[in-house]
UniProtKB/Swiss-Prot annotation:
Pfam families according to UniProt: Autoind_bind (PF03472), GerE (PF00196)
Family, as annotated: Belongs to the autoinducer-regulated transcriptional regulatory protein family.
Record's keyword terms, sorted: Activator, Conjugation, DNA-binding, Plasmid, Quorum sensing, Transcription, Transcription regulation
Protein name, entry field: Transcriptional activator protein TraR
DNA-binding in keyword set: yes
Gene behind the chain: traR
Biological processes per GO annotation: quorum sensing; regulation of DNA-templated transcription
Biological role stated in the UniProt entry: Positive regulation of conjugal transfer of Ti plasmids.
Signal peptide (residue range): none
DNA-binding region: 191-210
GO MF assignments: DNA binding
Recorded superkingdom: Bacteria
HTH luxR-type domain location: 167-232
Source organism per UniProt: Agrobacterium vitis
NCBIfam families documented for this protein: PRK13870.1 (NF010444)
């Protein structure tokens, strides 16, 4: 397992674009006998993924918002250090919904795995998982938690630096009016000024931005604007 961590660390140092990094991650997973890999970045309630999991599973996971149900994500949020997991071995203590989740994942060759979660900036979390179709991961020795966190920390930095386009992410959208108003916010306009420029009532601007803030589950226009820019919605 330490050899795998070394390979991951070496990969993050290779020059190249996001495509090269994704290919390298897939090669590492395959070389060590795993079904696939998944990097998740979770900030507040927003989640993005860089993964080679089956397309249908990725779509189902995000459409159904499975991150709120996923026992691996729940454990990663609370544990913040490397751990192995198995849907079969954990079955007796799982809820009916969690068992159904693992059963669906198993249809795509995801039955067990190793996950390394780390804390990242501004209260966010990143986690890297290698998934297996085996019912459990055989570990001949304990995984070095420090080395694992260091490897995933470097991976997170590399993905952030390259601004890799996510393989999947939770749905995010703005209607035309919301996008227009946020573009004005982004260049420093107040809601009163936006109302004047767009020739609408102040209350129309306020209500539209409040609707968008509620949908994105944020509490300030600054946060909403930052998310919209990050998601390339404006």
């Amino acid at each position: 397992m330490q050899h795998w961590l070394d390979k991951l660390t070496d990969l993050t140092a290779i020059e190249g674009d996001g495509c090269i990094l994704k290919t390298g991650l897939a090669d590492v997973a395959d070389h060590f006998g795993f079904t696939g890999y998944a990097y998740l970045h979770i900030q507040h309630k927003h989640i993005i993924a860089v993964t080679n999991y089956h397309h249908d599973w990725r779509s189902l996971y995000f459409d159904k918002k499975f991150d709120a149900l996923d026992p691996v994500v729940k454990r990663a949020r609370s544990r913040k250090q490397v751990f192995a997991w198995s849907g079969e071995q954990e079955r007796p203590k799982l809820s009916e919904e969690e068992r159904a989740f693992y059963a669906q994942a198993a249809d795509f060759g995801i039955r067990s795995g190793i996950t390394i979660p780390i804390r990242t900036a501004n209260g966010s979390m990143s986690m890297f998982t290698l998934a297996s179709e085996r019912t459990a991961i055989p570990l001949d020795r304990e995984i070095d938690a420090v080395a694992a966190a260091a490897a995933v920390g470097q991976l997170h930095a590399r993905i952030s630096f390259l601004r890799i386009t996510p393989t999947a992410e939770d749905a995010a959208w703005l209607d035309p009016k919301e996008a227009t108003y946020l573009r004005w916010i982004a260049v420093g306009k107040t809601m009163e000024e936006i109302a004047d420029v767009e020739e609408v009532k102040y209350n129309s601007v306020r209500v539209k931005l409040r609707e968008a803030m509620k949908r994105f589950d944020v509490r300030s226009k600054a946060h909403l604007t930052a998310l919209a820019i990050k998601r390339k919605l404006i």
